[in-house]
Amino acid sequence: MTKVITRFAPSPTGMLHVGNIRVALLNWLYAKKHNGQFILRFDDTDLERSKQEYKNAIEEDLKFLKINWDQTFNQLSRLSRYDVIKKLLLDKKRLYTCYETPEELELKRKVQLSKGLPPIYDRASLNLTTEQIKKYIEQGRKPHYRFLVNHELISWHDMIKGEVKYDGKALSDPIVIRADGSMTYMLCSVIDDIDYDITHIIRGEDHVGNTAIQIQMFEALNKIPPVFGHLSLIINKDEKISKRIGGFEIATLRKQIGLEAMAIASFFSLLGSSSQILPYKNMDELATQFEISNFSKSPTMYQPEDLVRLNHKLLISVDFDEVKERLKEIDATYIDENFWLSVRPNLQKLRDVKDWWDICNQTPNVENLNLDKEYLKQAAELLPQGEITKDSWRIWTKEITNITSRKGKELFLPLRLALTGRESGPEIAGILPLIDRKEIIKRLT
């Protein structure tokens, strides 16, 4: 059986966002599931927009999510190889030169759209005479190159969408080499996939048209195309996710919002599938349950609050030994196991533990809360004597009920507000032993 090899091919022109990290995760998990290899390729042929700092940031995000790669390379290092294939396809008459300026092409596009026609290149350059070409060269025009798409049926079995068919007539011949000599994504991606023996490609359904063209490129080079799978797009409030929509970058999720790596990985690996979205502890567990066949063809709604809830579920199950090193990262080495176990059920993000430490160790400002001072004074007098334990809360509130007849919210909420300054949070039974007895009396009176 052929060894499974997948790849993730980001362009270092911006930060990773939730759409392309989902693609990275699924390609990595598919390779892991089948004991294969995962390759990281940087599509950096856009010389103007590609930046080293984006490449570094992409690698940092992938490492944070424990997405490790077996090989990595960038396309700029392979220009001589692309040139060989360029000459081969020119000889096969599957590449042809064009001399239109960007302004001329834009005008053609606008005219087609105004007539209700799709903006498909008219192949005018195929009919240029030798004299016309000579004139363009004398004008200083440099050619760009297009791939000639055969006007025939293109079909493949998609891992997610099932049978997909495309009419070659509906596809525009893509520019594969720009006038400045730089390569576009289309052809060099195919060359890389051939040379690195890529067997499976999972990507967004916005690439379906590209896939149809690239299948012809594989065939023009006498190679069998990889198996493709096209994911439904992630949408948020009726617009697809892209790196141009702010707030969805992985760096934002992990640095500014403070989400756990496995919460992010679990969520986006399962989003859009029939599998229940659960917080997995590690990537090996996630790979074990991963099934590409579980993914839906329908668009997938991304609600950021669902991700935060999953992060909460993950933290609830994290033992103190697992989190000790992480506490060092957020300068919270003063947190001990008892405190962690007490506040863990109410943490949305790890750094929230510092807020709860402050609540327990710093008197909250309750001046504007309009507290029932007489009731709180009475409650202070009823606080059980001796050491404060987890049983103290039960004993204390029972005695308060006996004396005041208060129950439920009428009993609990004033105590919570006075002790924590908040209407909700960890169980008071858990944090009460963490507050010094004198401090409890002080907050109540």
UniProtKB/Swiss-Prot annotation:
Coiled coil: none
Homology family: Belongs to the class-I aminoacyl-tRNA synthetase family. Glutamate--tRNA ligase type 1 subfamily.
Enzyme class: ligase
Residue numbers binding ATP: 243
Protein name: Glutamate--tRNA ligase 2
HAMAP family on file: Glu_tRNA_synth_type1
UniProt motif ('KMSKS' region) ranges: 240-244
Catalytic activity line of the entry: tRNA(Glu) + L-glutamate + ATP = L-glutamyl-tRNA(Glu) + AMP + diphosphate
UniProt-listed InterPro entries: aa-tRNA-synth_I_cd-bd, aa-tRNA-synth_I_codon-bd_sub2, aa-tRNA-synth_I_CS, aa_tRNA-synth_I_cd-bd_sf, Glu-tRNA-ligase_bac/mito, Glu/Gln-tRNA-synth, Glu/Gln-tRNA-synth_Ib_cat-dom, GluQ/Sye
Entry function: Catalyzes the attachment of glutamate to tRNA(Glu) in a two-step reaction: glutamate is first activated by ATP to form Glu-AMP and then transferred to the acceptor end of tRNA(Glu).
Pfam families: Anticodon_2, tRNA-synt_1c
Keywords linked to the UniProt accession: Aminoacyl-tRNA synthetase, ATP-binding, Cytoplasm, Ligase, Nucleotide-binding, Protein biosynthesis
Any one of the GO CC terms: cytoplasm
EC number: 6.1.1.17
UniProt xrefs under PANTHER family: GLUTAMATE--TRNA LIGASE, GLUTAMATE--TRNA LIGASE, MITOCHONDRIAL-RELATED
Gene behind this protein: gltX2
Any one biological process term the GO annotation gives: glutamyl-tRNA aminoacylation
Subunit structure: Monomer.
Entry's localization field: Cytoplasm
GO MF terms held by the record: ATP binding; glutamate-tRNA ligase activity; tRNA binding
Secreted in keyword set: no
Organism phylogeny: Bacteria, Pseudomonadati, Pseudomonadota, Alphaproteobacteria, Rickettsiales
UniProt keyword Chaperone, yes or no: no
Motif annotated as 'HIGH' region, chain positions: 10-20
